[in-house]
Amino acid sequence: MSQSREGFESDQATLKVYDTKTSTVFSVTQGHDTSLEEIAWSSDEKGLFFTTHRPGFLVLGYISLKGKDLEYLVEDRSVIGLTVGPNNDVFFEASRIDSLPEIYRYEKTSRELSQISHVNKKQQEKWVFGQLEKIKIGEGDRQTHGFVVLPPGYNPYRQYSLLVLLHGGPRSAWTNQWHHRWNPQVFAAQGYVVALPNPKGSIGYGQEFSDAVRLNWGKASMGGTLAFTKHLQRRSDIRDDKTCAAGASFGGYLAHFINTRSQLFQCFISHAGIFNLDLFWSTTDRQWFPEWEFGGVPWLNKEVYEDLSPSSAIEGFRAPTLLLHGQKDFRVDVSQSIAAFTTLRRRGIPSRLVYFPDEGHWITRPQNLGLWYEEVHTWLAKYLR
Protein backbone atom coordinates (compact mmCIF):
# COMPACT_ATOMS: atom_id res chain seq x y z
CA MET A 1 0.00 0.00 0.00
CA SER A 2 1.41 3.39 -0.99
CA GLN A 3 0.50 6.99 -0.13
CA SER A 4 1.91 10.04 -1.89
CA ARG A 5 1.49 12.85 0.66
CA GLU A 6 3.96 12.66 3.54
CA GLY A 7 2.47 13.24 6.98
CA PHE A 8 -1.11 12.54 5.89
CA GLU A 9 -2.37 9.28 7.37
CA SER A 10 -5.67 9.38 5.45
CA ASP A 11 -4.20 10.02 2.02
CA GLN A 12 -5.48 7.74 -0.72
CA ALA A 13 -3.87 4.33 -0.31
CA THR A 14 -2.86 2.91 -3.68
CA LEU A 15 -2.12 -0.79 -4.10
CA LYS A 16 1.25 -1.44 -5.71
CA VAL A 17 2.98 -4.74 -6.50
CA TYR A 18 6.70 -5.42 -6.71
CA ASP A 19 7.62 -7.88 -9.46
CA THR A 20 10.60 -9.89 -8.19
CA LYS A 21 11.44 -11.15 -11.68
CA THR A 22 11.73 -7.73 -13.31
CA SER A 23 12.48 -5.70 -10.15
CA THR A 24 9.74 -3.26 -11.10
CA VAL A 25 6.82 -1.75 -9.19
CA PHE A 26 3.43 -1.26 -10.79
CA SER A 27 0.17 0.18 -9.48
CA VAL A 28 -2.89 -2.03 -9.48
CA THR A 29 -5.47 0.54 -8.39
CA GLN A 30 -4.21 3.68 -10.11
CA GLY A 31 -7.10 5.76 -11.39
CA HIS A 32 -9.61 4.44 -8.86
CA ASP A 33 -10.84 7.06 -6.37
CA THR A 34 -10.85 4.79 -3.34
CA SER A 35 -8.53 3.66 -0.56
CA LEU A 36 -8.16 -0.01 0.21
CA GLU A 37 -8.24 -1.18 3.83
CA GLU A 38 -7.45 -4.89 4.16
CA ILE A 39 -5.86 -6.85 1.32
CA ALA A 40 -5.31 -10.59 0.82
CA TRP A 41 -3.86 -12.52 -2.11
CA SER A 42 -6.23 -14.77 -4.01
CA SER A 43 -5.32 -18.45 -3.78
CA ASP A 44 -4.36 -18.52 -7.48
CA GLU A 45 -2.22 -15.38 -7.00
CA LYS A 46 -3.87 -13.69 -9.99
CA GLY A 47 -5.37 -10.88 -7.94
CA LEU A 48 -6.21 -9.59 -4.51
CA PHE A 49 -9.29 -9.45 -2.35
CA PHE A 50 -9.74 -6.24 -0.41
CA THR A 51 -12.09 -4.22 1.75
CA THR A 52 -12.83 -0.57 1.10
CA HIS A 53 -15.30 2.04 2.22
CA ARG A 54 -18.25 2.70 -0.04
CA PRO A 55 -21.18 4.95 0.94
CA GLY A 56 -22.47 3.38 4.14
CA PHE A 57 -20.60 0.07 3.98
CA LEU A 58 -17.15 -1.47 4.35
CA VAL A 59 -17.40 -3.77 1.34
CA LEU A 60 -15.54 -6.82 0.02
CA GLY A 61 -13.97 -6.49 -3.41
CA TYR A 62 -11.51 -8.06 -5.83
CA ILE A 63 -9.05 -6.72 -8.38
CA SER A 64 -6.86 -8.66 -10.79
CA LEU A 65 -3.19 -7.87 -11.24
CA LYS A 66 -4.02 -6.64 -14.71
CA GLY A 67 -5.43 -3.57 -13.02
CA LYS A 68 -8.90 -3.66 -14.47
CA ASP A 69 -12.02 -2.32 -12.76
CA LEU A 70 -12.54 -2.97 -9.08
CA GLU A 71 -15.09 -5.73 -8.61
CA TYR A 72 -17.35 -5.36 -5.58
CA LEU A 73 -18.46 -8.73 -4.27
CA VAL A 74 -20.32 -8.11 -0.99
CA GLU A 75 -21.99 -4.70 -0.66
CA ASP A 76 -25.03 -5.35 1.55
CA ARG A 77 -23.14 -5.67 4.85
CA SER A 78 -19.84 -4.52 6.33
CA VAL A 79 -16.86 -6.86 6.13
CA ILE A 80 -13.70 -7.19 8.26
CA GLY A 81 -10.97 -9.80 8.84
CA LEU A 82 -10.20 -11.40 5.46
CA THR A 83 -8.80 -14.92 5.17
CA VAL A 84 -8.51 -16.61 1.77
CA GLY A 85 -8.85 -20.39 1.51
CA PRO A 86 -8.49 -22.83 -1.41
CA ASN A 87 -10.40 -22.17 -4.64
CA ASN A 88 -10.56 -18.44 -3.88
CA ASP A 89 -13.05 -18.88 -1.04
CA VAL A 90 -12.92 -15.83 1.23
CA PHE A 91 -13.78 -16.04 4.93
CA PHE A 92 -14.59 -12.94 6.98
CA GLU A 93 -16.73 -11.41 9.69
CA ALA A 94 -19.75 -9.44 8.50
CA SER A 95 -22.51 -7.52 10.21
CA ARG A 96 -25.09 -4.78 9.84
CA ILE A 97 -26.59 -2.30 12.27
CA ASP A 98 -29.51 -4.70 12.66
CA SER A 99 -27.54 -7.94 12.27
CA LEU A 100 -24.98 -9.24 14.77
CA PRO A 101 -21.50 -10.30 13.60
CA GLU A 102 -21.06 -13.79 12.15
CA ILE A 103 -18.48 -15.57 10.00
CA TYR A 104 -19.29 -15.82 6.30
CA ARG A 105 -17.79 -17.47 3.24
CA TYR A 106 -17.83 -15.97 -0.22
CA GLU A 107 -17.21 -18.44 -3.06
CA LYS A 108 -15.84 -16.41 -5.94
CA THR A 109 -16.40 -19.13 -8.54
CA SER A 110 -20.11 -19.49 -7.82
CA ARG A 111 -20.48 -15.95 -6.41
CA GLU A 112 -22.39 -17.38 -3.47
CA LEU A 113 -22.36 -15.92 0.04
CA SER A 114 -23.07 -18.26 2.94
CA GLN A 115 -23.13 -17.84 6.70
CA ILE A 116 -21.00 -20.47 8.42
CA SER A 117 -21.25 -19.43 12.10
CA HIS A 118 -24.32 -18.88 14.27
CA VAL A 119 -22.76 -17.85 17.57
CA ASN A 120 -25.12 -14.88 17.95
CA LYS A 121 -28.27 -16.64 16.77
CA LYS A 122 -30.04 -16.58 20.15
CA GLN A 123 -29.38 -12.87 20.65
CA GLN A 124 -30.38 -12.08 17.07
CA GLU A 125 -33.72 -13.82 17.55
CA LYS A 126 -34.31 -12.45 21.06
CA TRP A 127 -33.52 -8.77 20.59
CA VAL A 128 -35.84 -6.33 18.86
CA PHE A 129 -33.97 -4.07 16.47
CA GLY A 130 -34.92 -0.64 15.23
CA GLN A 131 -35.58 -0.21 11.53
CA LEU A 132 -32.80 1.36 9.44
CA GLU A 133 -33.33 4.12 6.87
CA LYS A 134 -30.82 5.45 4.35
CA ILE A 135 -30.84 9.23 3.97
CA LYS A 136 -29.16 11.42 1.36
CA ILE A 137 -29.60 15.17 1.17
CA GLY A 138 -28.06 17.61 -1.29
CA GLU A 139 -26.05 16.86 -4.40
CA GLY A 140 -22.41 16.82 -5.44
CA ASP A 141 -20.12 18.82 -3.19
CA ARG A 142 -23.01 19.63 -0.86
CA GLN A 143 -24.37 16.13 -0.37
CA THR A 144 -24.55 14.41 3.00
CA HIS A 145 -25.33 10.72 3.19
CA GLY A 146 -26.14 8.81 6.34
CA PHE A 147 -28.50 6.56 8.24
CA VAL A 148 -31.43 6.88 10.60
CA VAL A 149 -32.28 4.17 13.13
CA LEU A 150 -35.88 4.20 14.34
CA PRO A 151 -36.90 3.03 17.82
CA PRO A 152 -38.23 -0.54 18.13
CA GLY A 153 -42.01 -0.44 17.89
CA TYR A 154 -41.81 2.79 15.90
CA ASN A 155 -45.16 4.53 15.33
CA PRO A 156 -45.17 7.03 12.42
CA TYR A 157 -47.98 8.98 14.09
CA ARG A 158 -45.91 9.69 17.20
CA GLN A 159 -43.16 12.26 17.68
CA TYR A 160 -39.71 11.24 18.89
CA SER A 161 -36.68 13.01 20.27
CA LEU A 162 -33.64 13.06 18.00
CA LEU A 163 -30.08 11.97 18.83
CA VAL A 164 -27.43 12.91 16.26
CA LEU A 165 -24.22 10.86 16.52
CA LEU A 166 -21.02 12.53 15.27
CA HIS A 167 -18.30 10.17 14.08
CA GLY A 168 -14.64 10.64 14.90
CA GLY A 169 -11.67 10.90 12.60
CA PRO A 170 -12.48 13.27 11.05
CA ARG A 171 -11.71 10.86 8.22
CA SER A 172 -14.00 8.06 9.26
CA ALA A 173 -17.64 7.25 8.54
CA TRP A 174 -20.76 5.69 9.94
CA THR A 175 -21.22 2.37 8.20
CA ASN A 176 -23.95 -0.23 8.30
CA GLN A 177 -22.01 -2.29 10.81
CA TRP A 178 -22.48 -3.65 14.34
CA HIS A 179 -20.16 -2.26 17.01
CA HIS A 180 -20.18 -2.22 20.81
CA ARG A 181 -19.15 1.45 20.98
CA TRP A 182 -21.69 4.12 20.05
CA ASN A 183 -24.15 1.43 19.03
CA PRO A 184 -27.19 3.21 17.53
CA GLN A 185 -29.51 0.32 18.42
CA VAL A 186 -28.73 0.85 22.11
CA PHE A 187 -29.84 4.48 21.84
CA ALA A 188 -32.84 3.70 19.64
CA ALA A 189 -33.98 1.20 22.28
CA GLN A 190 -34.30 4.16 24.67
CA GLY A 191 -37.00 5.59 22.42
CA TYR A 192 -34.98 8.03 20.31
CA VAL A 193 -34.64 8.41 16.57
CA VAL A 194 -30.89 8.13 15.98
CA ALA A 195 -29.20 9.98 13.11
CA LEU A 196 -25.80 8.96 11.69
CA PRO A 197 -24.66 11.66 9.23
CA ASN A 198 -21.50 11.42 7.13
CA PRO A 199 -20.61 15.07 6.37
CA LYS A 200 -17.49 16.39 4.66
CA GLY A 201 -14.39 14.64 5.90
CA SER A 202 -16.08 11.24 5.86
CA ILE A 203 -14.49 8.40 3.92
CA GLY A 204 -16.16 6.33 1.23
CA TYR A 205 -17.23 9.30 -0.88
CA GLY A 206 -14.02 10.03 -2.75
CA GLN A 207 -10.70 11.56 -1.71
CA GLU A 208 -11.75 15.15 -2.45
CA PHE A 209 -14.75 14.85 -0.11
CA SER A 210 -12.47 13.47 2.61
CA ASP A 211 -9.79 16.11 2.05
CA ALA A 212 -12.27 18.99 2.43
CA VAL A 213 -11.77 19.26 6.20
CA ARG A 214 -8.07 20.10 6.08
CA LEU A 215 -7.52 23.66 7.35
CA ASN A 216 -11.29 23.77 7.82
CA TRP A 217 -12.07 21.53 10.80
CA GLY A 218 -15.46 22.11 12.30
CA LYS A 219 -16.71 24.44 9.60
CA ALA A 220 -16.62 21.87 6.79
CA SER A 221 -18.29 19.11 8.81
CA MET A 222 -20.75 21.37 10.64
CA GLY A 223 -22.57 22.42 7.46
CA GLY A 224 -23.56 18.91 6.44
CA THR A 225 -24.34 17.91 10.02
CA LEU A 226 -26.72 20.83 10.56
CA ALA A 227 -28.36 20.33 7.16
CA PHE A 228 -28.90 16.63 7.93
CA THR A 229 -30.35 17.50 11.35
CA LYS A 230 -32.69 20.19 9.99
CA HIS A 231 -33.89 17.80 7.29
CA LEU A 232 -34.92 15.32 9.97
CA GLN A 233 -36.43 17.97 12.24
CA ARG A 234 -38.85 18.88 9.47
CA ARG A 235 -40.34 15.38 9.60
CA SER A 236 -43.66 14.98 11.34
CA ASP A 237 -42.30 12.16 13.54
CA ILE A 238 -39.46 14.28 15.01
CA ARG A 239 -39.67 16.83 17.81
CA ASP A 240 -37.54 19.80 16.81
CA ASP A 241 -37.26 20.97 20.42
CA LYS A 242 -35.71 17.74 21.70
CA THR A 243 -32.42 17.19 19.86
CA CYS A 244 -29.01 16.22 21.22
CA ALA A 245 -25.65 15.67 19.48
CA ALA A 246 -22.97 13.30 20.75
CA GLY A 247 -19.57 12.17 19.56
CA ALA A 248 -16.05 11.09 20.48
CA SER A 249 -12.59 12.39 19.57
CA PHE A 250 -13.20 14.51 16.44
CA GLY A 251 -16.90 13.91 17.06
CA GLY A 252 -16.46 15.34 20.56
CA TYR A 253 -14.59 18.29 19.06
CA LEU A 254 -17.42 18.82 16.58
CA ALA A 255 -19.92 18.77 19.45
CA HIS A 256 -18.01 21.62 21.13
CA PHE A 257 -17.64 23.49 17.83
CA ILE A 258 -21.36 23.29 17.04
CA ASN A 259 -22.26 24.24 20.61
CA THR A 260 -20.43 27.55 20.19
CA ARG A 261 -22.09 28.36 16.87
CA SER A 262 -25.60 26.87 16.74
CA GLN A 263 -28.77 26.79 18.83
CA LEU A 264 -30.16 23.73 17.08
CA PHE A 265 -29.43 21.32 19.94
CA GLN A 266 -30.72 21.11 23.49
CA CYS A 267 -27.73 19.15 24.82
CA PHE A 268 -24.35 17.72 23.84
CA ILE A 269 -22.13 14.79 24.78
CA SER A 270 -18.39 14.96 24.14
CA HIS A 271 -16.19 11.93 24.79
CA ALA A 272 -12.44 12.66 24.52
CA GLY A 273 -13.33 15.78 22.58
CA ILE A 274 -10.73 18.37 21.55
CA PHE A 275 -11.42 21.79 23.09
CA ASN A 276 -8.20 23.76 22.55
CA LEU A 277 -6.20 23.06 19.38
CA ASP A 278 -2.98 24.65 20.69
CA LEU A 279 -3.15 22.39 23.73
CA PHE A 280 -4.00 19.43 21.50
CA TRP A 281 -0.83 19.94 19.46
CA SER A 282 1.36 20.10 22.58
CA THR A 283 -0.12 17.05 24.35
CA THR A 284 -1.02 14.51 21.65
CA ASP A 285 1.17 11.50 20.90
CA ARG A 286 1.00 12.33 17.19
CA GLN A 287 2.10 15.93 16.61
CA TRP A 288 2.37 15.33 12.90
CA PHE A 289 -1.42 14.91 12.81
CA PRO A 290 -2.43 18.48 13.81
CA GLU A 291 0.52 19.86 11.86
CA TRP A 292 -0.96 18.35 8.70
CA GLU A 293 -4.55 19.25 9.52
CA PHE A 294 -3.82 22.89 10.44
CA GLY A 295 -0.90 23.62 8.16
CA GLY A 296 1.99 23.50 10.61
CA VAL A 297 2.83 24.36 14.21
CA PRO A 298 0.59 26.69 16.24
CA TRP A 299 3.00 29.64 16.47
CA LEU A 300 3.36 29.80 12.69
CA ASN A 301 -0.33 29.18 11.96
CA LYS A 302 -1.92 31.00 14.87
CA GLU A 303 -4.91 32.25 12.87
CA VAL A 304 -5.94 28.74 11.73
CA TYR A 305 -5.56 27.18 15.19
CA GLU A 306 -7.54 29.99 16.85
CA ASP A 307 -10.25 30.15 14.20
CA LEU A 308 -11.03 26.43 14.42
CA SER A 309 -10.62 25.99 18.18
CA PRO A 310 -13.83 25.80 20.28
CA SER A 311 -11.94 27.49 23.12
CA SER A 312 -11.75 30.64 20.98
CA ALA A 313 -15.55 30.97 20.94
CA ILE A 314 -16.33 30.45 24.61
CA GLU A 315 -19.01 33.15 24.56
CA GLY A 316 -21.06 30.97 22.23
CA PHE A 317 -21.35 28.00 24.60
CA ARG A 318 -25.00 27.60 25.51
CA ALA A 319 -26.24 23.99 25.70
CA PRO A 320 -25.67 21.59 28.63
CA THR A 321 -22.77 19.21 27.97
CA LEU A 322 -21.70 15.83 29.33
CA LEU A 323 -17.96 15.18 29.08
CA LEU A 324 -16.27 11.78 29.40
CA HIS A 325 -12.55 11.02 29.21
CA GLY A 326 -9.89 8.46 30.11
CA GLN A 327 -6.71 9.37 32.00
CA LYS A 328 -4.57 7.12 29.78
CA ASP A 329 -5.68 8.81 26.57
CA PHE A 330 -2.48 9.80 24.77
CA ARG A 331 -4.26 10.76 21.55
CA VAL A 332 -6.41 13.49 23.11
CA ASP A 333 -5.16 14.35 26.58
CA VAL A 334 -7.67 14.39 29.45
CA SER A 335 -6.82 18.07 30.01
CA GLN A 336 -9.01 18.86 27.01
CA SER A 337 -12.18 17.71 28.77
CA ILE A 338 -11.09 19.22 32.09
CA ALA A 339 -10.60 22.59 30.37
CA ALA A 340 -13.96 22.35 28.60
CA PHE A 341 -15.71 21.34 31.84
CA THR A 342 -14.12 24.19 33.80
CA THR A 343 -15.15 26.67 31.11
CA LEU A 344 -18.73 25.42 30.94
CA ARG A 345 -19.10 25.52 34.72
CA ARG A 346 -17.59 29.00 34.92
CA ARG A 347 -20.08 30.13 32.29
CA GLY A 348 -22.92 28.73 34.37
CA ILE A 349 -23.86 26.07 31.82
CA PRO A 350 -25.03 22.70 33.21
CA SER A 351 -22.24 20.18 32.69
CA ARG A 352 -20.84 16.94 34.08
CA LEU A 353 -17.39 15.36 33.76
CA VAL A 354 -17.03 11.57 34.00
CA TYR A 355 -13.41 10.53 34.50
CA PHE A 356 -12.04 7.03 33.85
CA PRO A 357 -8.59 6.67 35.51
CA ASP A 358 -7.82 3.32 33.83
CA GLU A 359 -9.04 3.96 30.27
CA GLY A 360 -7.42 5.38 27.16
CA HIS A 361 -8.91 6.96 24.05
CA TRP A 362 -11.63 4.31 23.95
CA ILE A 363 -13.57 2.72 26.79
CA THR A 364 -12.61 -0.95 26.57
CA ARG A 365 -13.27 -2.57 29.95
CA PRO A 366 -16.78 -4.09 30.14
CA GLN A 367 -17.58 -2.66 33.57
CA ASN A 368 -16.44 0.81 32.50
CA LEU A 369 -18.37 0.54 29.25
CA GLY A 370 -21.50 -0.27 31.23
CA LEU A 371 -20.95 2.80 33.40
CA TRP A 372 -20.29 4.89 30.28
CA TYR A 373 -23.62 3.91 28.73
CA GLU A 374 -25.39 4.50 32.06
CA GLU A 375 -24.02 8.04 32.30
CA VAL A 376 -24.89 8.79 28.68
CA HIS A 377 -28.43 7.41 29.00
CA THR A 378 -29.03 9.42 32.17
CA TRP A 379 -27.88 12.62 30.47
CA LEU A 380 -30.00 12.05 27.39
CA ALA A 381 -33.08 11.22 29.44
CA LYS A 382 -32.70 14.50 31.31
CA TYR A 383 -32.89 16.60 28.14
CA LEU A 384 -34.71 14.48 25.56
CA ARG A 385 -37.63 13.06 27.56
Label the model's feature ranges.
Residues 44-46, 87-88:
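Short coil/turn segments that connect the beta-strands within blades of beta-propeller domains
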Residues 6, 111, 119-241, 248-249, ...:
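Cap/lid segment of the alpha/beta-hydrolase catalytic domain
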Residues 1-16, 27-36, 51-61, 75-77, ...:
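A flexible loop/linker signature enriched in serine peptidases of the S9 family
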Residues 19-23, 63-68, 107-111:
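Short loop/turn segments that connect beta-strands within beta-propeller blades
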Residues 196-385:
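Active-site-proximal cap/loop segments of hydrolase catalytic domains
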